[in-house]
Amino acid sequence: MIALQIVSDLHLESPIAYDIFEITPKAPYLALLGDIGYLVQHEAEYVEFLKRQLSNFRIVFLVLGNHEPWHSTWDKCLQIARRWERELNENGGKQAGSGELVVLDRDRYEIKGPAGDTVIVLGCTLFSRVPSEAAEAVSFGVNDFYHTAGWDVEQHNEAFERDLAWLNAEVAALEDAGRAVVVLTHYSPTIDERTADPRHRTSVIGSGFATDLSTAACWRSRDVKLWAFGHTHFNCDFTDAGTGKRVVTNQRGYYFSQSEGFIDKVVEI
């Protein structure tokens, strides 16, 4: 069994608070599930925030959210994140007592539990499936398409299908291996009413935030014991009756409109 601390949607970009926001360590492993801040525009501040977390956690998992590439591009954002991963983890540059940074962009990581058991962590942004009838509303109503260069609904949908295909393949490959699987994403994989603010459940731009994956192999698998995500600014923690998996979010939200229920959330797997 391992203990994983879950945090997302800190939005340290406004007001800028990378240097003062503290995460109190309650577990050896930390999952940052996106929208921590502007990764490219605030590169220096963001990486210093990560370094502080690495001094407190054995592993810091980083999933990129839709705000990370704002005022830049997705390619540039991922390029910087991968560079940090290399530089912060290489033996020559790694400080004593510093943890490991693991960027999850269609990536798999294995954690050995204290009893010899293995937990498989799968992570990606996921994005969402925007149907054609909602494309115009989402394009005009979601700020990502204004603030991320070279990004539109078509590319967003392509990224979703790519991430979903990867998740399905990874989970299928692990079927019946006897290992617990944890899935970490930024976007929501479900439209279960427990995962969304009642005020937004009928929103015309809802498909820009969540996708119903109830028929997808990665969701239906009973090997997946935990699916944690962010993006919705609405906190939840429940067990999906159909699969037995725990569904968890722990999102702070914007500083001036913080989400109810943001706590020091730790999940044991």
Region spans (language model):
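Active-site neighborhood of phospho(di)ester-bond hydrolases with catalytic His/Asp-centered motifs
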Residues: 5-8, 30-35, 61-66, 102-106, ...
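Active-site environment of divalent metal-dependent phosphoester hydrolases
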Residues: 11-17, 38-41, 67-77, 110-113, ...
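Binuclear metal-dependent phosphoesterase catalytic core
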Residues: 113-115, 206, 211-226, 233-269
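Active-site-proximal loop/helix segment associated with metal-binding centers of metalloenzymes
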Residues: 120-182, 187-204
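Short amphipathic alpha-helices and their capping/turn segments at secondary-structure boundaries
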Residues: 20-22, 48-52, 97, 103-118, ...
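Hydrophobic alpha-helical segments and helix pairs
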Residues: 78-145
